[in-house]
Amino acid sequence: MPGKEAAVNVMQSSTKSNTKKMVQARLPFKRLNPVPKDEGCLEEKKVRITKNVSPQKMLHSLNSSMEDMENDCDMETETVPIPKAVNGKGPLDNYIRKAPKVSHAPSITTIDLTEESNISISNDCPLNGESETHLANGTLALEESTPNLPLSAKEECTVSLENKTVENTHFSELKSDQLHQAAATSTSASNFSPERVVKEDCNSSADDDSASVSSSSSPVSLSSPDAQTGSQFRNRSSPSTSTTPTGKVTANKTSADKNKTKDKDKQRQAEKEERERAKKEARSAKKKKRQGLLKNLQRKRGKTSESSGKEYKKEKKEREDKEKAEKMKLKEEKKREKLEALEAKQEEKRKKDEEKRQKEEEKRQKEEEKRLKEEEKRVKAEKAEITRFFQKPKTPQAPKTFSRSCGKFAPFEIKKGMALAPLCRIDFEPEASEELDRFLQEQNSKIYFFDEIKKRKPRKMGQTTVPTVNSFEVDDVQVLGESDPVLGSNMLEGHIKDIGVPERKKFGRMKLLQFCENHRPAYWGTCNRRSRVINSRKPWAQDTGMLDYEVDSDEEWEEEEPGESLSHSEGENDDDPKEDDEDDDGFFVPHGYLSDDEGVSDEECTDPENQKFRQKLKAKEWYELQTNGKKIRAMQPVVIGCVWWDSKASEISLLQKFSACILESPAVDEELAQEISSAQSLKDRQILSKLVPLLHGNVNGSKIMIQEFQEYCRRGLFLEDNASDAAGNESTSPNVTPQTPSNIIVPSKARLKRLISENSVYEKRPDHRMCWYVHSDVLKGLQQDNLPVPCQWTYITQVNSVAKEDNGANGGSLQSLPLSGKRKSAGSMPITKFMKRAKDLETAINTDMDGFQADNEEDDDDCMILEDQQAKDAEDSTIECKINLNDSAVLASCQN
């Protein structure tokens, strides 16, 4: 049958074309209304339904999502969870569009006319009751599912493909049995709802490959999957025919065709209902499957929740352990940082301490070096002070003088004893120069020059410079130089000439005779013999008449015997350097200083600081004496010579200061002489005879006793006692005038203190307490051996005395003291006080250094002997003015 043959040809061509490579077509336009793709929705893919496939597998394949095969030819299907229905619609509802129940379109044709596509539509693709169209060799064969459609009828249709129309396409008429068979096949397939997922071309996408084919009756939308499956065709024609199809498909409509179309419409309506029912069943099956999947998922989630709980706890525990470990790690890091910071601080502190210690060490070393330098400097200074006495003072060097540059000679130094020769030794006077000019003008040509020379004698000229003799080089006499302004220049020159050796001109110059072969010393002296043989032209000639050349003077020379060495005498030991230093130190004492044992106490001698200070003073004064020109040198006599009456005035003025003068002593008044003699006649013995009764057995200090005795003398009591002695001595010394109260003399404080220290001692004896005891020999000499102890002196001044009568029943005269100054009775005072007092007195004895044991107060240093002062005043009075010594006011002023 022609229909079957055509179908077989179509299948064969389709099988052959399947082996060809698919290339995706890229269209030059964009989609007008792109459909948004949801995650849960399946992508639009071309689906091809195959036969002999079970409905379950077809349903599974429809529910599975297809991957995009744009870059990969192999397509793999994966099972994805079915998304839930939203508003009663599933994921496939967006692709299904309900067609109207009554459709007058005789056929729905979908043709894939993509460029470079030569794939024909296979017979295995049923269109679910719709017509299947095959395009082969430029003709489009349409197979209708309605059995009543006449096969011989030709229809003219227009197929739109990307703005291109296919006209005059002749569809071959199919037989009625083929259409019925195709309709039955499609009906049976629709009852089972077979759906098969077919792999698309690797080079084409679902949206780009879909094209809308509009017929004259009703167009079909390409968005639904059913329409897509029904609109696929395989182009079996050549590429040139398939790309640009032209022509019209004509069909002759008859009554049979109309009946067929009606039947076809009915059949289509039934197929549509059947298809909707199949869709509902498929939806319910999908829903059940989805519910089962959800239950399985919940069951799995329940199982996983238990395991996840354990895992969660485990993870939580691990997380907590991890957090704890991190916290511990942070704590350890913080602790380590603190320790590092502490160590850094300690290291820094240690470095600072080390630097401080180093600075202190350096400072200490510097101080030590400074102290050592000062000590060394001090030792050197002390040594220099000691050795300075042995060193000769250095004379300042005279400044060097240089000559002026003269001609070709460079300047040279003019040393001591040198002098430059003048350019002209003759000094022309103005008269001589005028005479020379006159002779040059009035020359006489008749007189010969040689004759004039023979007539004249050669002139003599003395020394250009007169040598000066230093006074230090002459040991015999002293030269009076410029320091004495009285001397004149003539006298100085004559004096210098007289200083020389008297016979120097007679004997000539000094000569040195020395030979290297001789052992005897050289001869230095004068030799006034002159030889007639030996002269300057014959220096090696021998004068046998004057000298004996056969005698060897070396044989006659005898060495002198060494003298006695006085450096190491017997009984002397000079090995001790300390003794030498002490002797030298005591020997080199400048004038005006006392020795070590004069005027210095023991404490000052033992004190090293005072000793150093005294040595420095000595060295300083010695240095001043040396530097100020007061040098110690041997005295030299000054020889001036005889001075006559008609001598020069300079010589007379020089000796004027040595002229003799008559000294006349002035007349002294007799009264003043008597006063001086009376003062001198007052001797220590007389004073001591009146002082012993006060001194012997007295417990007071020397100062109190001196004040008491001076007051005793001022009141004239001392003179009254001496009046009888003076009257007894009138026969022997009639010139001594009796002392009256007007000429009272008070001994000085120093004199009384000296008498007390020389003639008494302050000590404690077994019979009596501590007090002053006069020496027994002094008492015998003064015939006062029976003086009581304690003393029975009646005090004139008020003195706080501690004297006490040893025996209360003794009926002697007691010391007249005020009531407040007397001691209390022994019964009213504790004995410990007396013991303490005795102890204090003993300590006073031990600590006293000057011999006045009872003195507790400092003595006045400005004390003078009264007799000397009065003598001086008397001498001044004789020169300047006359003073009446009888005046009491003058006496009071002298005493003060």
Swiss-Prot record:
One BP term from GO: DNA repair
Compositionally skewed regions (Low complexity) per UniProt: 211-226, 237-246
Compositional bias (Basic residues): 285-302
Location of the protein in the cell: Nucleus
Chain intervals with Acidic residues compositional bias: 552-563, 572-586, 595-607
Entry GO terms, CC: CAF-1 complex; nucleus
Record's subunit section: Homodimer.
Family (UniProt): Belongs to the CHAF1A family.
Job description of the protein: Involved in chromatin assembly in DNA replication and DNA repair.
Coiled coil: none
Pfam entry (one): CAF1A_dimeriz
Database matches in InterPro entries: CAF-1_p150_acidic, CAF1-p150_C2, CAF1_p150_N, CAF1A_DD
Region Necessary for homodimerization, competence for chromatin assembly, residue ranges: 642-678
Listed Polar residues bias regions: 10-21, 227-236, 729-743
Main location: nucleus
Region named Disordered: 1-23, 185-377, 552-610, 724-743
Key words, A-Z: Cell cycle, Chaperone, DNA damage, DNA repair, DNA replication, Nucleus
Name of the featured protein: Chromatin assembly factor 1 subunit A-A
